[in-house]
């Protein structure tokens, strides 16, 4: 199983069900040292950027997914984002999608 932290369009249960192919419950967590910005990816989608670790964090949901579902999320995110392992406030590490540099507007 793979940990995935989501903070944008995948917070919407309808979008998650369409991408994951099943209904899954996540748990709330946060990513310290980042800030969320709306519309910075391709001028439309949210993204997160490094920020002051003492004052900034991004709230989101943490899911434990089979690798097959994570591969579907990779396809959904496409070339707009890349996946990186980061540490969450809970102490768990998870994959997080960060904006691809060439997509930031």
Which residues make up each language-model segment?
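Glycine-aromatic micro-motifs
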Residues: 1-105
